[in-house]
Amino acid sequence: FAYVDFSYKLQTSGESALFLGLKGGGNFYSADPTALSAYLSVGDPSQVSLSKFNPNIGAGAYFKATNYWVSFSIPRLFNVKRDSDNLAVTAKDRVHTYLGGGVDLPVSNGIYIKPSLMIRKVKGLPTTADITGMVSWQNQFDIGLSIRTNSSMALMSMISLGMFDVGYAYETPTDNGLSQLNLRTHELVLRINL
């Protein structure tokens, strides 16, 4: 895939700003199953070469105030089919819509509780939500828990080291059907604040 992102900041007041974003690009799909070697040289007529570029665009808005934020985005505005006239199976990239918000609540000197909610809607699928609660100390160290409805939960942490933020997250399924699979993940994050 290849995309170009553009964002613009509108200062709405001294302490708040609206960020508007656009993205454009697309996904490249290429497969040549005829180049695979097989034990038997019997041809399969459904194995045809595929080379395709699917363009797409996306848009989003993010409003940030002193102690709260709200966001809305549609990263890919078009439904895109990945198929060919000779293929038996088709796949479709569906439009994902995200709506989110969060607040920073002061608890005591330098300690904040930061609850947030991200709602995800995909046509034809149940709506899901990520419910997150973080505790922040001096805006230097954050630790928290996130629950994705009917899917998973995660433990997260982030430490600020000057212009770098370093984080770790561990995610595990909560759905009984998924918990039998080894779908646990460990994630490391390195963010550079320019």
Question: What are the language-model segments listed below?
Answer:
Residues 1-194:
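Subset of outer-membrane beta-barrel
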